[in-house]
């Protein structure tokens, strides 16, 4: 699963504003 998240995180950071991207990153990290 870590490989999938590593692929998604950069994409989320590009599509979403930094503040929202950080929130999503925290949620994904907690999900793991």
UniProtKB/Swiss-Prot annotation:
<dbReference type="InterPro" id="IPR027582">
    <property type="entry name" value="Amanitin/phalloidin"/>
</dbReference>
<keyword id="KW-0800">Toxin</keyword>
<feature type="propeptide">
    <location>
        <begin position="19"/>
        <end position="32"/>
    </location>
</feature>
<comment type="similarity">
    <text>Belongs to the MSDIN fungal toxin family.</text>
</comment>
<feature type="propeptide">
    <location>
        <begin position="1"/>
        <end position="10"/>
    </location>
</feature>
<protein>
    <recommendedName>
        <fullName>MSDIN-like toxin proprotein a</fullName>
    </recommendedName>
</protein>
<comment type="function">
    <text>Probable toxin that belongs to the MSDIN-like toxin family responsible for a large number of food poisoning cases and deaths.</text>
</comment>
<feature type="cross-link" description="Cyclopeptide (Ile-Pro)">
    <location>
        <begin position="11"/>
        <end position="18"/>
    </location>
</feature>
<dbReference type="GO" id="GO:0090729">
    <property type="term" value="F:toxin activity"/>
</dbReference>
């Amino acid at each position: 699963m870590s490989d999938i998240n590593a692929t998604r995180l950069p994409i989320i950071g590009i599509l979403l504003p930094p503040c929202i991207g950080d929130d999503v990153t925290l949620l994904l990290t907690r999900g793991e």
